[in-house]
A protein has these predicted regions:
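Conserved PLP-enzyme active-site core in the AAT-like
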Residues: 1-211, 219, 230
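Conserved PLP-binding catalytic core of the aspartate aminotransferase-like
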Residues: 217-248
Length: 248
């Protein structure tokens, strides 16, 4: 209780609701940051801040964040960078290549891909030093529920994963059913093919709308006119995803 974290304001609405309401009831406080200038994260840091959370490709606005710059700020602060990569998928963007410490996905969307199942995944890079500065005692100090076992000392580069699985999963129960796991794995088999098609279709539609007299604006990072085009080419060289917004 009392811990804080920073989050980009450009997020999926369900995440914002969770951070503002559900997490607050648990005593975790989120401070939202305008990510258009990465230095805004540095300016918002406090001694109680334990993480930075972002969507590298924001849902649904088609906004691309400067992943490398935000990673550097998190590293300077000694806190993990958590990236929601749902919209980009591992096929289009590899956040760990740019220094992300934890990645989360809603598998319900592109990974599953067929509307058959709901779920989520958590991936740990194994490179973050949880013992540094004593900021994360729940991972680095003995756990009485496991006879004094210290997760980071025992499991090393997958200590966070083991803590999440053996404690959070056990106590709160967010376990995927076998059927949902099967459908998700089946969907992942066609992820590259599907994402290539999604990107190609999205570009065609975005270009059409961008040139239509009745359309006021289109926010899609794949367009040449997008202010996020360079960031998209850097972090998502295979395409800027398939979710975007436009106004009339």
């Amino acid at each position: 209780p009392g811990d804080e974290f920073l989050s980009s304001i450009n997020l999926y609405g369900g995440s914002i609701t969770q951070f503002v309401h559900s997490f607050k009831r648990l005593g975790w406080n989120c401070h939202f940051v305008d990510p258009s200038d990465p230095e805004n994260f540095r300016r918002a840091l406090t001694p109680k801040c334990k993480a930075i959370f972002i969507e590298v490709l924001a849902n649904p606005g088609g906004i691309v964040l400067d992943l490398e710059a935000i990673t550097a700020i998190a590293q300077d602060a000694g806190i993990p960078l958590i990236v929601d990569n749902t919209m980009a998928t591992p096929y289009l963007c590899r956040p760990m290549d740019w220094g992300a410490d934890l990645i989360v996905h809603s598998t319900t969307k592109f990974l599953s891909g067929h509307g058959t199942s709901m779920g989520g995944v958590l991936i740990e890079s194994g490179k973050f030093d949880w013992a540094k500065d004593g900021k994360f005692p729940t991972i680095t100090e003995p756990d009485p529920a496991y006879h004094g076992l210290t997760f980071y000392e025992t499991f090393g580069d997958f200590g966070f994963t083991m803590k999440a699985r053996t404690v959070a999963l056990r106590d709160f129960g967010p376990a995927m059913s076998p059927a949902n796991a099967f459908y998700t794995l089946t969907g992942i088999e066609t992820l590259p093919l599907r994402m290539d098609r999604h990107v190609a279709n999205a570009m065609k539609v975005a270009e059409f709308l961008d040139g239509h007299a009745a359309v006021d604006w289109v926010s899609y990072a794949g367009l040449k006119s997008s202010p996020y085009r360079q960031l998209a080419e850097k972090y998502m060289p295979k395409g800027a995803g398939s979710v975007f917004t436009f106004g009339l």
